[in-house]
């Protein structure tokens, strides 16, 4: 499994990079689960990582606003993100999801076809009035997306595993692979979840709180990144 770590500033990005994260993900927790950070923060992180890892950037938890989302996605791509990640928050239908993701993918790939688009559903989709992540792989593949992900929409300490069990997450992973997509699992994951994640087999796991000592509002600790990297390689 690859490890995606989500710093919020330059200093944390250096720690995540030196700790051995496979992907350095720029987000802004103050603006939500997949809250967008500023373009200059993405550029700054890109500079300090200096090619050691690809950069991912979130553009927000989006309802049905394809124009706004596609413009935000292009902004993240121009700022230097290699992966552009959008959350499908309060998306009511597969048709809405398809149009949103198609327009985002067009905006990104028209600028640079090598950049990857990540579509995130939410394990707690019933709490946030959105579509099931299990519907996402087929829609994302049709839209030309590269990676599908599941995360928690409401960051209240509850884990993805409290909303989707091992069987459902394995189904999500298998559906992604059947559609030729990479997949990622995130959402208040803990070290004790690693054996289950190994059985599920996602390509990527996304963390913040786990490498902050359990509280995503505190700073990332390099020794915890290193510990997680080591355990992911066992």
Curated annotation (Swiss-Prot):
InterPro entries: 4HFCP_synth (IPR007565), 4HFCP_synth_arc (IPR035081), RibuloseP-bd_barrel (IPR011060). Pathway: Cofactor biosynthesis; methanofuran biosynthesis. The keyword Lyase applies. GO terms for molecular function: carbon-carbon lyase activity. Its EC number is 4.2.3.153. It catalyses: 2 D-glyceraldehyde 3-phosphate = 4-(hydroxymethyl)-2-furancarboxaldehyde phosphate + phosphate + 2 H2O. The active site is at residues 27, 85. Keywords: Lyase, Schiff base. Transmembrane segments: none annotated. SUPFAM superfamilies: Aldolase, Ribulose-phoshate binding barrel. Catalyzes the formation of 4-(hydroxymethyl)-2-furancarboxaldehyde phosphate (4-HFC-P) from two molecules of glyceraldehyde-3-P (GA-3-P). Belongs to the MfnB family. This is (5-formylfuran-3-yl)methyl phosphate synthase. It comes from Methanosarcina acetivorans (strain ATCC 35395 / DSM 2834 / JCM 12185 / C2A). The lineage of its organism: Archaea, Methanobacteriati, Methanobacteriota, Stenosarchaea group, Methanomicrobia.
């Amino acid at each position: 499994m690859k490890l995606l770590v989500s710093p919020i500033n330059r200093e944390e990005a250096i720690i995540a990079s030196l700790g051995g994260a496979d992907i350095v993900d720029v987000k802004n927790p103050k603006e939500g689960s997949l809250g967008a950070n500023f373009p200059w923060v993405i550029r700054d992180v890109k500079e300090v990582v200096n090619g050691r890892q690809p950069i991912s950037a979130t553009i927000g938890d989006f309802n049905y606003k394809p124009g706004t989302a596609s413009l935000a996605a292009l902004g993240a791509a121009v700022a230097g993100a290699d992966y552009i990640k959008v959350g499908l928050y309060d998306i009511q239908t597969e048709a809405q999801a398809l149009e949103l993701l198609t327009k985002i993918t067009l905006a990104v790939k028209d600028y640079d076809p090598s950049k990857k688009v990540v579509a995130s559903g939410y394990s707690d989709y019933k709490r946030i009035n959105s579509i099931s992540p299990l519907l996402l792989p087929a829609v994302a593949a049709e839209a030309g997306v590269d990676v599908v992900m599941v995360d928690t929409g409401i960051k209240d300490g509850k884990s993805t595993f409290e909303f989707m069990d091992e069987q459902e997450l394995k189904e999500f992973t298998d559906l992604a692979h059947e559609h030729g997509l990479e997949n990622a699992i995130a959402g208040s994951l803990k070290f004790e979840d690693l054996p289950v994640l190994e059985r599920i087999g996602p390509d990527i796991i996304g963390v913040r709180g786990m490498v902050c000592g359990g509280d995503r509002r505190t700073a990332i600790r390099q020794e915890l990144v290193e510990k997680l990297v080591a355990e992911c390689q066992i």
